[in-house]
Amino acid sequence: DALLAEKQNFNTTNYFRPGSGNGGPCHPRDGVVLTWLTDKLKMESKLLTNITQVRQDQALALAKHLVSYDLPIIILGKSFKQGVDLTVGSYSILVGEYCTMLGAKIMYDDVLHQPAVVLLAHPNRKLLEKYEPAEDSVIVDLWNLGIPNAKVWGNNAT
């Protein structure tokens, strides 16, 4: 009933867009709080725990994809969402930790003058404009922003 009464259309690109795990950057932080609350209230549902696990599984799959290029990895965007300095709950850091665990060298927002895999972790072309990847670099675009020659990863690959 609540969704039917809502005037905003949830079936739009505002909600259904490519990007990081389970709906966007804020959802993991919300999931931590809601998981704690369900535990405190002794609720039987493990839905939020399962959602968190799926997010981690997706991050590991993305890390394996990035590492498969056998190049240093640069992640553009370290905060948990664009425009803030907070990194707690950051999908970028989670992916970076998995990359490190898999033996890759990772950097955040650093410029290399040699080919690298560049993960565009936030939907902001200006991050990529600020960083000019070396020739033969591989750009992995989570957001399918239409960046020429970029590899798009996930369900929304073209």
Each model region followed by its residue ranges:
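Structural/interface elements that position substrates and couple domains in central-metabolism enzymes
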Residues: 1-158
